[in-house]
Amino acid sequence: MSRSPQRALPPGALPRLLQAAPAAAPRALLPQWPRRPGRRWPASPLGMKVFRRKALVLCAGYALLLVLTMLNLLDYKWHKEPLQQCNPDGPLGAAAGAAGGSWGRPGPPPAGPPRAHARLDLRTPYRPPAAAVGAAPAAAAGMAGVAAPPGNGTRGTGGVGDKRQLVYVFTTWRSGSSFFGELFNQNPEVFFLYEPVWHVWQKLYPGDAVSLQGAARDMLSALYRCDLSVFQLYSPAGSGGRNLTTLGIFGAATNKVVCSSPLCPAYRKEVVGLVDDRVCKKCPPQRLARFEEECRKYRTLVIKGVRVFDVAVLAPLLRDPALDLKVIHLVRDPRAVASSRIRSRHGLIRESLQVVRSRDPRAHRMPFLEAAGHKLGAKKEGVGGPADYHALGAMEVICNSMAKTLQTALQPPDWLQGHYLVVRYEDLVGDPVKTLRRVYDFVGLLVSPEMEQFALNMTSGSGSSSKPFVVSARNATQAANAWRTALTFQQIKQVEEFCYQPMAVLGYERVNSPEEVKDLSKTLLRKPRL
């Protein structure tokens, strides 16, 4: 930085000025050079005083913010999580233990009728109080394994001390999970939630799939305790999370609980049958607190999800002694999954991008497709375009995660033994009644004639799958083999390259020629190893 030139004083002017000015003036009259950058001058007392005043104001502001935060937290705990309800040794804890051991410790029979104001911890899984099963007919029905009629605000079977049965349908996109979920959604004794982790992925977009696994598990942990306020954390910006209603939950327009009495007069939960989303969207929106009340009435709570990639992510929930969680792993031929992903590629573009971001950068790419001219930078949107490329690229991450889960299931640790069941989609559509009975037996539900007929109707329809995100009655054979005529041979070989490990475990045979693919008389299914 150049110095600006200073005008010279005439001879003899400086002594005269020094004599006429006060003692402090010489410094002021001397030529003033520009201050160098970074040079610090001694602070004046006035400046230090102003600085101290600002520091005090800032500290006071931080202290006030801390106090307001603590008050807000205490207010939340007072309304949402009463401390005396959480204490097993408190009066309500003793009442809960006497009513059947709500914290896992069976207590002695109650000496008298329970007090009306004593209620269980709302955060713990449902366990019927003694009053709910005190009647002799209800107790006899529960011991005989017959579903007792809903009453006293509870549904389903269960005796004193029984835990709520929790189920997670563990699967991936385009695996027939919407139809499989309806087998629980239509059951009058089941509270069903459809892909609630969708809210996490939408809120935290564009986070990759692997980094969102912890948040997904935390949401499931809250939902299995009927704490539906967790939806408010992941509501869209500007939508007012505290004012979120039932109709703001993903999949609510086809949820049988949301669309049925007492939340909505459009349908009845005990009547088996699909709901019309156009009718359900006209239902009055209900507060989440009201939805929580309905959740606590059901003994069986089922959540279907496609955004948990490894069963090990659920290990903390499976280890939790307060939760009785079982995992149903719904699988489908990866080639059929890939074909369905391509057909619905535009509806899954965001999810495909989030999954592809989780790929190992050192992993191989797609040699079969690249050799056939499928490039990521392709301009066209048809076959071989970028949407197809991402749809198939996501299969690498999905199949690698599936291989890890199956490896864990082949040698199950303690937390997974007796809590894991594999169901192939091909077996479901091939023999729906047998598969339904197997699934219901695993989770402790009774198969009604209405549910058997519903499963048969859904797999014997004449409709096609032109609308990939709508559940409808379809031809089972057509749905199971559609990939053999929809995919090119290069696409099939690329999927097999990604998924050969889970295919070997699950009993899906690989193909060797295009002629073998087109020969629909040859089955490519064999007995699975699980």
From Swiss-Prot:
Glycans are attached at N243, N457, N475. The chain crosses the membrane at residues 55-75. Residues 89-119 are annotated as: Disordered. The record marks N152 as: Not glycosylated. Glycosylation at Asn-475 is required for catalytic activity. Belongs to the sulfotransferase 1 family. Gal/GlcNAc/GalNAc subfamily. This is Carbohydrate sulfotransferase 2. It comes from Homo sapiens. The gene is CHST2.
